[in-house]
UniProtKB/Swiss-Prot annotation:
Site (Important for catalytic activity for the proton relay mechanism but does not participate directly in the coordination of zinc atom): D152
Enzyme type, top EC level: oxidoreductase
Primary localization: cytoplasm
Annotated localization: Cytoplasm
GO BP term (any one): L-threonine catabolic process to glycine
Function: Catalyzes the NAD(+)-dependent oxidation of L-threonine to 2-amino-3-ketobutyrate.
Binding site for Zn(2+) 1: C42, H67, E68
EC number(s) stated in the UniProt entry for this protein: 1.1.1.103
Gene designation per UniProt: tdh
Any single Pfam family the record assigns to this protein: ADH_zinc_N
Subunit details: Homotetramer.
Name of the molecule in the record: L-threonine 3-dehydrogenase
List of residues binding Zn(2+) 2: C97, C100, C103, C111
Organism placement in taxonomy: Bacteria, Pseudomonadati, Pseudomonadota, Alphaproteobacteria, Hyphomicrobiales
Amino acid sequence: MTNMMRALVKTRPEVGLWMERVPVPEVGPNDVLIRVRKSAICGTDVHIWNWDQWAQKTIPVPMVVGHEFMGEIVEVGPAVTKHHVGERVSGEGHIVCGKCRNCRAGRGHLCRNTLGVGVNRPGSFAEFVCLPEYNVVSIPDDVPDEIAAIFDPFGNAVHTALSFDLVGEDVLVTGAGPIGIMGALVAKRCGARKVVITDINPVRLDLARKVGIDYVVDASKENLADVMRVIGMTEGFDVGLEMSGAAPAFRDMIDKMNNGGKIAILGIAPAGFEIDWNKVIFKMLNLKGIYGREMFETWYKMIAFVQGGLDLSQIITHRIGIDEFGDGFEAMRSGNSGKVVMDW
């Protein structure tokens, strides 16, 4: 194997990414080297491409980016015991310290010292990516490559959706991006009574209808209260999944929650915004922030969902070769796509 590889790199502090030749990562004693088969583009990668304020404060240059992937192990460190060469794998993109209070208590997703693959350390938009053995997840034979490549965002959806009991509950999802749609699918799969998803993007609303979400609402044209009456809801929503990061959507969700309702919040707002805290207090709402995936319960759950028949294939709207990465990023930046998966 050559000691150089192709990778998408943030080589300079401006808009874009560039295909470069960079060294193959060195494998430490507890590390696994993975030959990447498929990569998917995340909203985080779009922020890095756009070189927005968050990216400028966060990303060291140069940096190999990307963190949604699947591949095959080609080398293991001498201390690795649970994985082997030739194994199909994906990986948890949050590298935790293992030493802080939360890590030692089994709450790694709450680690204060988390490093992000493709953010703080070299990522998976490359022919090879290196991860600690602890972060590597085996992919069963009955899970397709392209589905394993989107397990990172699917995990965000699963973590958000499973934050609260969904059985027999009425669920509102604000934001019909890929993660929002996947969250709605999980809610349906778990036995929610009515699942309503809202957005203002017609392309994403059409995708939500295509995958089988029962109640799809264009918030720019329809009043959510009217929709609730039409579908027979006499009280508010029991569970809210906030996936949009949009102030109007979040305010509408708070307004439409039942007393004692529970809201899991994954969407990141571009700037701070006001909400009516009196409604939160007097409705006795429970708000929970979500970041990433629970390690590794979320991974077990999402593998089980896929093996149990949950079809995510329609969430992938663009399948391209890695040399077409520019087209993939344009699709993601337009907001008129589902997931974009790139083949190495």
